[in-house]
């Protein structure tokens, strides 16, 4: 007897299909543990966690791979570039939340059966955006501080040497 690999996960017309990847327990647990879908978080806290991750992770590529990578100001340039991008992302989030009637309501899918409804209102999105900029700037400054400590500085020099052109 043949077994279907892809099952209908709701409305097939919009592509909500249950595949072995998106309906596996591992994938569902992983996706639902992310701050955007985790239960019990306020919109501001969601933005704070997501912004912190973005600010922290964007600092490294800007400081190590940026145009000033082989200078003494590589760390400062990376910090300023990260702050600039976080501000641009915050403006984009704010524009998205204020355009039209606000962010569209999240629909339940196979992977995320209970999306947070309070986030997808104008007020919730505004709180998310304010948390995002605070977390993003905090993450960037923390990464800058961490990369300038004497314990991490040798690792920064190794990483900069890997991607430098001599």
Swiss-Prot record:
Main location: membrane
Gene3D superfamilies: Photosystem I PsaL, reaction centre subunit XI (1.20.1240.10)
InterPro entries the record matches: PSI_PsaL, PSI_PsaL_sf, PSI_suXI
Keyword Membrane: yes
Any one GO biological process: photosynthesis
Disulphide bridges: none
Bilayer topology term: Multi-pass membrane protein
TM region(s), chain numbering: 77-97, 128-148
Pfam families, A to Z: PsaL
Localization of this protein: Cellular thylakoid membrane
Top-level division of the source organism's lineage: Bacteria
Cellular component GO terms held in the UniProt record: photosystem I reaction center; plasma membrane-derived thylakoid membrane
Protein keywords: Membrane, Photosynthesis, Photosystem I, Thylakoid, Transmembrane, Transmembrane helix
Family of the protein in this entry: Belongs to the PsaL family.
Name the record gives this protein: Photosystem I reaction center subunit XI
Organism: Synechococcus elongatus (strain ATCC 33912 / PCC 7942 / FACHB-805)
Record lineage: Bacteria, Bacillati, Cyanobacteriota, Cyanophyceae, Synechococcales
